C-alpha cells in the first residue's frame, strides 16, 4: 500500500471550552475558589480566570494528505500556537510521507529549541503530533490504539476529577479527585478548611472509595507535608502537583515526607522525555501524569511511558479525553484513566471537549470500551466557529 504525502497544514483558533477547558462561563466549578500559585495575591484568589488562565483558547490543527484524508487534533495554544504551526512548523510536514512521524517530531522539536522546550511551543508540537497520528490511523483505516500495539485490556476504568466526589461514586467511578481550595497564603484556617472538606467527602463516600487532592502547583514543601500528614487520617490516596513543576528537589523531599502508603503524583505541566527523566531519576513521585496534548504528543508519551515503566512508576495521563484513552488502553503501566467532570456543577458526565468535538465517548458506570473508529474517532462540530488567523 503506497502511503500518501502531506499536502496542507492548517491551524485554527476556537473560543469557549474545547481543549482550553478553563475557558468556561461564570459559575463553573473549575473556576471557583481553587488554590493556585497566584493565590498569594488576594485579588487573584477567588477565580482562576482573574489572572488569565483562559487567555490562550483552543488550537485546532488540521493536516490533509495527498489522497484527501484529513487528520486533526485539538489542544491548548490558541493564536500563539496557530502562528507557530503556520509560520514555522508547516515546513517540516508538507511534502513528507504520512508515516514519517518520528522524523517530523524531531525536526519540530529541535528547530524550536531556542525558543521552546516546554510551554505553549510543546503544546503546539503536541497538537501537530496528535493530528499526524489521527491522519495515519485514518489512512490505515484503524484506530490509533492499533498503531500503538493494540489494547492490553478490554475496557478502561476511570476516576473523576471535580468538586463532587460523592456524586462521582454514585456514577460508578473508582475515585474522586478534589481541587484544593485554600492556599498557604490563607494560613492555618485555610489548612483546616482543606482538611475539613476532605473529611466531609470521606464521610459521604465511605472508606473504600479513592480520594485525592489536586494542588495545582500552589504549595511549598512545608505546607504540602503538613497537608499530607493531616489528610492521611482521611485516607488520601495521593497528593497531586503540590509544588511548582521545576522544583524537582522539593518533590523528592516531599515524597520522603508523606505518610507511608500515600502517593505523590505530578507531571501535568512537565514536557518531553528529558523533563520526565528528571522526575523519575530524582525519585520525585510514584505516579506521573503527562498531558498528551502538552508533553509532546503520542510520539513523546511513548518514550515517557517507557522511562516510567523502567522506574516502576505508573503513568496516568492528565485529562485529554480520546487522546489519552487510545494510549492508556495499550499500556500495562497505565491501569486507569482520568475523567475531567466538565458539567458546571460536576453532577453529570459530559464530554471533556464539549461542544467542540462530536462522537467523543464518555464513561458509563465509570468504564469505557474505546471505540474502534479510525483515527481518534472524533469529528469537529461544524457549529463551532473556527478562525484561521495566519496562513503560510
Curated annotation (Swiss-Prot):
Positions contributing to Mg(2+) binding: 214, 240, 268
Note in the entry: Reaction proceeds via a syn dehydration.
SUPFAM superfamilies referenced in this protein's UniProt entry, alphabetically: Enolase C-terminal domain-like (SSF51604), Enolase N-terminal domain-like (SSF54826)
CDD domains on file: MR_like_2
Species: Paraburkholderia phymatum (strain DSM 17167 / CIP 108236 / LMG 21445 / STM815)
Summary of the function given for this chain in its UniProt record: Catalyzes the dehydration of L-rhamnonate to 2-keto-3-deoxy-L-rhamnonate (KDR).
Family annotation (InterPro entries): Enolase-like_C_sf (IPR036849), Enolase-like_N (IPR029017), Enolase_C-like (IPR029065), L-Rhamnon_dehydrat (IPR023444), Mandel_Rmase/mucon_lact_enz_CS (IPR018110), Mandelate_racemase_C (IPR013342), Mandelate_racemase_N_dom (IPR013341), RHMD-like (IPR046945)
Cofactor(s) in the UniProt record: Mg(2+)
Family the UniProt entry places it in: Belongs to the mandelate racemase/muconate lactonizing enzyme family. RhamD subfamily.
Gene Ontology BP, a term: amino acid catabolic process
Residues that coordinate or bind substrate: 22, 48, 338
Name of the protein in its database record: L-rhamnonate dehydratase
UniProt entry keywords in alphabetical sequence: Lyase, Magnesium, Metal-binding
Pfam families registered for this protein in UniProt: MR_MLE_C, MR_MLE_N
Enzyme class per UniProt: lyase
EC nos: 4.2.1.90
Active site: 318 (proton acceptor)
Residues carrying the site annotation Transition state stabilizer: 338
Gene that encodes the chain: rhmD
Residues at the site labelled Increases basicity of active site His: 291
Catalytic reactions of this protein: L-rhamnonate = 2-dehydro-3-deoxy-L-rhamnonate + H2O
Quaternary structure note: Homooctamer; tetramer of dimers.
Domain of life, per lineage: Bacteria
Cofactor note: Binds 1 Mg(2+) ion per subunit.
Amino acid at each position: 500500500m503506497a502511503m500518501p504525502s502531506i499536502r496542507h497544514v492548517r491551524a485554527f483558533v476556537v473560543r469557549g471550552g474545547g481543549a482550553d477547558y478553563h475557558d468556561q462561563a461564570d459559575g463553573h466549578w473549575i473556576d471557583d475558589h481553587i488554590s493556585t500559585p497566584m493565590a498569594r495575591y488576594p485579588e487573584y484568589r477567588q477565580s482562576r480566570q482573574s489572572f488569565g488562565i483562559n487567555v490562550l483558547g483552543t488550537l485546532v490543527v488540521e493536516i490533509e494528505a495527498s489522497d484527501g484524508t484529513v487528520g486533526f487534533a485539538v489542544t491548548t495554544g490558541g493564536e500563539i500556537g496557530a502562528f507557530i504551526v503556520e509560520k514555522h512548523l508547516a515546513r517540516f510536514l508538507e511534502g513528507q510521507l504520512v508515516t514519517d512521524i518520528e522524523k517530523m517530531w524531531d525536526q519540530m522539536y529541535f528547530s524550536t529549541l531556542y525558543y521552546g522546550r516546554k510551554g505553549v511551543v510543546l503544546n503546539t508540537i503536541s497538537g501537530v503530533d496528535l493530528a499526524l497520528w489521527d491522519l495515519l490511523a485514518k489512512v490505515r483505516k484503524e484506530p490509533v490504539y492499533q498503531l500503538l500495539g493494540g489494547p492490553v485490556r478490554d475496557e478502561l476504568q476511570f476516576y473523576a476529577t471535580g468538586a463532587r466526589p460523592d456524586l462521582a461514586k454514585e456514577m460508578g467511578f473508582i475515585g474522586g479527585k478534589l481541587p484544593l481550595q485554600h492556599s498557604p497564603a490563607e494560613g492555618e484556617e485555610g489548612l483546616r478548611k482543606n482538611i475539613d472538606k476532605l473529611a466531609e467527602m470521606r464521610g459521604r463516600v465511605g472508606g473504600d472509595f479513592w480520594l485525592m487532592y489536586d494542588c495545582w502547583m500552589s504549595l511549598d514543601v512545608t505546607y504540602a507535608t503538613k497537608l499530607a500528614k493531616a489528610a492521611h487520617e482521611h485516607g488520601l490516596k495521593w497528593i497531586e502537583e503540590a509544588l511548582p513543576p521545576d522544583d524537582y528537589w522539593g518533590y523528592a523531599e516531599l515524597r520522603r515526607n508523606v505518610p507511608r502508603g500515600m502517593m505523590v503524583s505530578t507531571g501535568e505541566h512537565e514536557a518531553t522525555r528529558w523533563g520526565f527523566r528528571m522526575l523519575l531519576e530524582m525519585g520525585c513521585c510514584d505516579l506521573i501524569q503527562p498531558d498528551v496534548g502538552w508533553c509532546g504528543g503520542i510520539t513523546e508519551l511513548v518514550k515517557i511511558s517507557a522511562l516510567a515503566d523502567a522506574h516502576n512508576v505508573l503513568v496516568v495521563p492528565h485529562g485529554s479525553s480520546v487522546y489519552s484513552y487510545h494510549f492508556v488502553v495499550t499500556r500495562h503501566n497505565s491501569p486507569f484513566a482520568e475523567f475531567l467532570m466538565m458539567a458546571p456543577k460536576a453532577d453529570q458526565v459530559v464530554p471533556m471537549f464539549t461542544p467542540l468535538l462530536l462522537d467523543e465517548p464518555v464513561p458509563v458506570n465509570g468504564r469505557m470500551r474505546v471505540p474502534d473508529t479510525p483515527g481518534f474517532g472524533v469529528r469537529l462540530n461544524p457549529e463551532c466557529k473556527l478562525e484561521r488567523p495566519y496562513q503560510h
